[in-house]
């Protein structure tokens, strides 16, 4: 893990409540912790000039959507990002999807869900329920984009938006 990732990870508060959307009031408490962690992560990223995503959810906090972006050779590449909170959350990590990249890389499942199984999922399992959405972005989506997006650009499979 590089120093920038370690630094951004340390700035993300850990979650305490082990709850999923089916847990009623406990889920509301977990959702508050998730938002606090996301806000801290976004603020830290902005403070370090590494702002790279924005997220929002439906009212129940079960469906999340937003944008993520990656700069390559001074050009911004922006993507829609979405995921649902699994019923077994936080034991099961969310499956983060970049739908417009579906089928463009082998490190992706149907529907544009990024492949995180080898490196991220064991880390998530060791840190349940402390890790949350912000951690999934910092340790899952961020590193995935850092590897895959430049490769897709070099192969001519993605173009910057006008």
Swiss-Prot record:
CDD domains: UBCc_UFC1. Interacts with uba-5. Expressed in the intestine. Transmembrane segments: none annotated. The keyword Lipoprotein does not apply. The keyword Disulfide bond does not apply. This is Ubiquitin-fold modifier-conjugating enzyme 1. GO terms for biological process: protein ufmylation; response to endoplasmic reticulum stress; reticulophagy. It holds the Pfam family UFC1. Belongs to the ubiquitin-conjugating enzyme family. UFC1 subfamily.
């Amino acid at each position: 893990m590089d120093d920038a990732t370690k630094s951004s990870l340390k700035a993300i508060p850990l979650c305490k409540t082990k709850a999923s959307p089916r847990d009623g009031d406990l889920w509301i408490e977990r959702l508050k912790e998730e938002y606090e962690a996301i806000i801290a992560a976004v603020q830290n990223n902005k403070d370090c000039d590494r702002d790279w995503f924005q997220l929002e959810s439906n009212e129940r906090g079960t469906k999340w959507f937003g944008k993520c972006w990656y700069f390559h050779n001074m050009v911004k590449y922006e993507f829609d990002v979405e995921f649902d909170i699994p019923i077994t959350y936080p034991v099961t990590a969310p499956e983060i999807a970049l739908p417009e990249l579906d089928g463009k890389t082998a490190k992706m499942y149907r529907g544009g869900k990024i492949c995180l199984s080898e490196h991220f999922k064991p880390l998530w399992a060791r840190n349940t329920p402390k890790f949350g959405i912000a951690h999934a972005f910092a340790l899952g989506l961020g590193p995935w984009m850092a590897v895959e997006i430049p490769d897709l650009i070099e192969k001519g499979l993605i173009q910057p938006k006008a």
